[in-house]
Amino acid sequence: KKKPKPHYNVAVGIIWDESKILITKRKESGLLGGLWEFPGGKIKKKENVFNAVKREIKEELSINVMPKELIHEVDHHYSHFSVTIRAIDCVYKSGKIELNAATDYKWISPPQLYDFAFPKASIKLFNSIKGIT
């Protein structure tokens, strides 16, 4: 009997600074290496999704954001694990971006998302982003 695949709950921020959103690039090595993503990470047990997204973004990028609302939730199954991703609209508040985990970042307008290579699970979030079309 196969072991059940681990399941992760992840919170990501769609971080707005006026009409631009922030995307970050994953390290080349490791899972989904070199792909772009929305910043965020795993939600801890008993942590609410807004606190998780603020904490993860602060840890990864050293910036402060204000979470506004949950805009989308998506389940995705990879070969060795599954994820539930909750996308939170956030507003950039303060701080200078430091790449503590990612290798690059860009502020882009939503239609430019299609110009970057994202993991399949993240692409499922695109349609819920304001101004994508």
Which residue ranges define each predicted feature?
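Conserved N-terminal beta-strand and adjoining loop/helix that marks the start
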Residues: 1-22
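Acidic pyrophosphate-coordinating catalytic loop
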Residues: 3-4, 29, 73-85
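C-terminal lobe/hinge of AMP-binding adenylation domains
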Residues: 25-27
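A conserved beta-turn-beta hairpin within the catalytic core of GNAT-like acetyltransferases
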Residues: 30-35
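Short aromatic/basic micro-patch
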Residues: 37, 82, 106-107
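The catalytic Nudix box helix
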Residues: 38-72
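NUDIX/MutT-family hydrolases
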Residues: 89-129
